[in-house]
């Protein structure tokens, strides 16, 4: 399945971005992980069917209600295998 690496910038920490991203990933069938970065961004590695990935990326450009997304850097990467979508902490 195609895999993408995302860096989401803006007011994206402390607004339930990771938890909501997991919900959206689970709903769309996307697998991978999401984590906060030291720089204050959110980083995501996601795999799924092309249509599901596009829906997930579109959601990432908006985020949860309290988020203010300024930029989503998206790049295709070598296919990765994940069993589910996880929130990575720390």
Regions found by a protein language model. Give the residues of each.
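Intrinsically disordered, low-complexity, mixed-charge
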Residues: 1-90
């Amino acid at each position: 399945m195609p895999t993408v690496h995302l860096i989401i910038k803006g007011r994206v920490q402390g607004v339930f971005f990771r938890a909501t991203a997991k919900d959206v990933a689970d709903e769309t069938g996307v697998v991978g992980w999401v984590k906060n970065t030291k720089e204050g961004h959110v980083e995501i590695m996601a795999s799924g069917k092309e249509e599901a990935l596009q829906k997930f990326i579109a959601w990432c450009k908006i985020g949860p209600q309290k988020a203010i997304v300024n930029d989503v850097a998206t790049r295709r990467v070598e296919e990765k295998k994940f069993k589910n979508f996880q929130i990575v902490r720390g």
